[in-house]
Amino acid sequence: MGVKGLNQLIKEHSPSAYKEFQLKNLFGRKVAIDASMCLYQFLIAVRQSDGQQLTNEDGETTSHLSGMFYRTIKMVENNIKPVYVFDGKPPVLKGGELEKRLLRREEAQKQKTALGDEGTVEEVLKFEKRLVRVTREQNEEAKKLLELMGIPCVDAPCEAEAQCAELARGGKVYAAASEDMDTLCYEPPFLLRHLTFSEARKMPIDQIEYKDAIAGLDMTKEQFIDLCILLGCDYCESIKGIGQATAFKLIKEHGSLDNIVEWIKNNKTKYTLPENWPYDEARQLFMNPEVTNANEISLKWKEPDVDGLIEFMVRQKGFSEDRIRSGAEKLKKGLKGGVQGRLDGFFKVVKNDDKKRKADPKETKSSKKKRR
C-alpha cells in the first residue's frame, strides 16, 4: 500500500530531494530492487494484444518471467547491476493489511462474475488486474530465472524494502528501488521509483534523496516515521479525517505521535483513534526492522547459464529460443565488462564562489607574468 500522500508532501516541502532521469543515467550503479513489487507490476502490465496475461501452451502464466527477463537485460545493457530482494515472512502486524487485500480481491471476483458476458473488454480487464497476486510458485520461478541469468538474489528475513534499504545504507548498492514510499522509513540514501516500468509507459525514473527529504520537511527520523504512520501504512490504519496536510500540521504542532494521541484523548476533537491502535508497534518495525546485516551479504554477478536458460525458458516455459539466446548474449556482453566507474566516483565536487576570486595582494607583477 505504501504511505498515502507522502509523495506529494515531499514534493511540496522538499523539491530538491527529487530528481527525474532516464534509465541510462544510472550507468555504473548497483541497485537493490524489491522483487515482489516488480513481479506484481509485470503480472499487471505484461499482456498480450487482447489484454490477457502471457501464457504458454499449457496455460501457465509467463508474464512475470517475460518482464523479469527483458527488463533486467535492459538494465544490464545500460551498465546497471541489479540485485533482487524477495520478501520473507510478513510481520504479524501486517496481517490486517493482507486481509484487506484478500477481501478486495474477493470483491473484485464477485464484480467480474456479475458482469457475465455483458461486460466490455475494458471492464473485465479492470477486475482481472485487481485479482492479480504473486504466488509462491511465481516467486520461485523468478528466482530460478535470475540465477540462470547470473543476477544475485537476496531472501529477506522479513520485508524486502527494508532489506533493500539496508544494502544501500551498508554501501553494497547505490539505492533501493521500490514503488512503496514507506521504503524511506528505513533510511535508504536514495529511493528509486519506476525503475522496472516498461519504456512504453514513458515514465521517467524518480529518485528521492532521504537526507534532503527530511531536511526539507524539517523533521527528525522519528518524526518522519510518525508522519508516515499518521498518513497510513501497511502496519496500521490511519485516523479518519486526517489527510496529508493535517498530518503534517499535527506533527509540527505536537512533535510526536505520542503527543498527538494524548491530545486527541484529552481534548474534544473531531478525530477518533482506531480501537487498540498499534502505532507504537508500527513505529518499532520501522525503527528496528528485521534485516540481514549488509556486511553479511556477498553480491556476485556471474556469466549467464545459456543452456540452463534454454531448458527453462524455451523447453519448459515456451519462449522463443532465438529471443532467449539473443537476450543471453546481451547479458554476457553487459556483465563481462563489470560496472564502469562513474566520473562522480573519481572527482570531488567543489562549489565555485559566487564572486570572482580576487588576486592575492601579495602577488607580484613578475609572478603574474611568469604564469602567463
From Swiss-Prot:
Phosphorylated. Phosphorylation upon DNA damage induces relocalization to the nuclear plasma. Residues 1-105 are annotated as: N-domain. Residues 339-347 are annotated as: Interaction with PCNA. InterPro entries: 5-3_exonuclease_C_sf, Flap_endonuc, HhH2, PIN-like_dom_sf, XPG-I_dom, XPG/Rad2, XPG_CS, XPG_DNA_repair_N. DNA binds at residues 47, 71, 159, 232, 234. Its EC number is 3.1.-.-. The keyword DNA-binding does not apply. Mg(2+) 2 binds at residues 180, 182, 234. One of its GO terms (molecular function) is 5'-flap endonuclease activity. It is an enzyme of class 3 (hydrolase). SUPFAM superfamilies: 5' to 3' exonuclease, C-terminal subdomain, PIN domain-like. Binds 2 magnesium ions per subunit. They probably participate in the reaction catalyzed by the enzyme. May bind an additional third magnesium ion after substrate binding. Residues 123-254 are annotated as: I-domain. GO terms for biological process: base-excision repair; DNA replication, removal of RNA primer. One of its GO terms (cellular component) is mitochondrion. Keywords: DNA damage, DNA repair, DNA replication, Endonuclease, Exonuclease, Hydrolase, Magnesium, Metal-binding, Mitochondrion, Nuclease, Nucleus, Phosphoprotein. It is found in: Nucleus, Nucleolus; Nucleus, Nucleoplasm; Mitochondrion. Interacts with PCNA. Three molecules of RAD27 bind to one PCNA trimer with each molecule binding to one PCNA monomer. PCNA stimulates the nuclease activity without altering cleavage specificity. Structure-specific nuclease with 5'-flap endonuclease and 5'-3' exonuclease activities involved in DNA replication and repair. During DNA replication, cleaves the 5'-overhanging flap structure that is generated by displacement synthesis when DNA polymerase encounters the 5'-end of a downstream Okazaki fragment. It enters the flap from the 5'-end and then tracks to cleave the flap base, leaving a nick for ligation. Also involved in the long patch base excision repair (LP-BER) pathway, by cleaving within the apurinic/apyrimidinic (AP) site-terminated flap. This is Flap endonuclease 1.
